[in-house]
A protein has these predicted regions:
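Catalytic-core environment of secreted peptidases
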Residues: 1, 22, 129-133, 138-185, ...
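Subtilisin-like serine protease catalytic core
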Residues: 1-45, 59-64, 117-121, 148-155, ...
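Hydrolase catalytic cores
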Residues: 8-11, 31-37, 66, 111-114, ...
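Solvent-exposed loop/turn segments at secondary-structure junctions
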Residues: 17, 36-40, 72-75, 104-108, ...
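Short beta-alpha junctions and helix-cap segments that line functional grooves
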Residues: 19-20, 84-88, 108-112, 143
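Short acidic, glycine-rich surface-loop motifs adjacent to enzyme active sites
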Residues: 51-78, 101
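Catalytic-core regions built around general acid/base machinery
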Residues: 82-98
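Glycine-rich, charge-decorated loop segments at or immediately adjacent to ligand/cofactor-binding or catalytic sites
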Residues: 104-118
Length: 211
């Protein structure tokens, strides 16, 4: 449906049609896993299968960063949510840098999407220069999910531009989209640049640097 295409372009577009459309880390190697259908909908079983695939094959494909620009607004205490968190946390324990969208159900508190509520991974919110909150500019956009989580974990961990982002679309076209899904590959791409310069950095190192 173009969601993943848009995300990939933000992170790693090689600017085939001009330098104005360069991604954050254009020389990155991309491994794409499709877990949504043509309408942009998906089921948790497909999501878990994708996470399991990364867990099994990340060394073979030299994967270091996992960008997850999907999530669920469900209850943190449900068995389905706990299962999802278990799989996401396993990727972090594998040494992977896991960046997950915080969701678009803000600005109220406790609105971080699952699995962005995990205390281990890096949860990304969306910033908007045109939105002002509590007298401060350049902070979260009005829709960006906010913490704390029900476990009192402060989220998101970092915010990045996510409103009116121009990137790749279907059929060799471009389009504008907004959301924490768009902000997440900005962070993932930035981490890719850091790992290119400092390949010995671990996911824990990067989790400290972004602060």
């Amino acid at each position: 449906n173009g969601h993943g295409t848009h995300i990939t372009g933000i992170a790693a577009s090689s600017a085939t049609f001009g330098s104005d459309y360069l991604g954050i880390a254009p020389k990155s190697h991309i491994v794409s896993l499709k877990v949504l259908d043509a309408s942009g909908n998906g089921v948790q079983s497909a999501f878990l299968q994708g996470l399991d695939w990364i867990h099994e094959y990340h060394r073979s494909y030299q994967i270091r960063i996992v960008n997850i620009s999907i999530g669920s607004p469900g209850s943190e205490d449900s068995s389905a949510s706990k299962e999802l968190l278990k799989h996401v946390n396993a990727l972090w324990d594998d040494g992977l840098v896991v960046c997950i969208a915080g969701g678009n159900h803000g600005p109220k508190p406790y609105s971080i999407s699952i699995p962005g509520n995990s205390p281990k991974i890096i949860t990304v919110g969306s910033s908007d220069d045109n939105f002002q909150m509590i007298g401060r500019k350049h902070f979260s956009s009005g829709y960006s999910g906010r913490g704390p989580t029900t476990s009192c974990v402060m989220k998101p961990d970092v915010v990045a531009p996510g409103t009116n982002i121009f990137s790749c679309s279907l059929n060799n076209r471009y389009t504008i989209k907004s959301g924490t899904s768009m902000a997440t590959p900005v962070v993932s791409g930035s981490f890719a640049l850091l790992l290119e310069k400092y390949p010995f950095y671990t996911n824990k190192d990067l989790s400290l640097i972004h602060i």
